[in-house]
Amino acid sequence: MVDSLWHGFADMGSVVANGRFVVARGEGTRIWDTNGNEYLDATAGLWFTNVGHGRTEVAQAVADQLTKVAHYSGFGDTTADITVELADRLGDIAPV
């Protein structure tokens, strides 16, 4: 695996010497590596898993949206209807 995947932020010398930390699954705030060891996912909220792993209602909402449109650029004066809907909902609850 070390030969086929070089992550841009990894210390590859350490990976070669000590092996790679590979996550196999997650549930809520916990993750498990490929050896079955369980960890608290302390970096879950870093980008996009701040709602936890394995949330079937989130997976279903994503699947539903992907059948409509996966992504549309917000550059210029274009956007997607779901983006407008989210902005309106956030505007309704944001303390501004």
Kindly give the residue locations of the regions a language model identified.
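Active-site and channel-lining beta-strand-loop segments
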Residues: 20-41
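Active-site-adjacent loop/helix segments that line or gate small-molecule/cofactor pockets in enzymes
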Residues: 1-27, 68-69, 77, 82-83
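Glycine-rich loop-to-alpha-helix module at the N-terminal edge of alpha/beta enzyme cores
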Residues: 38-96
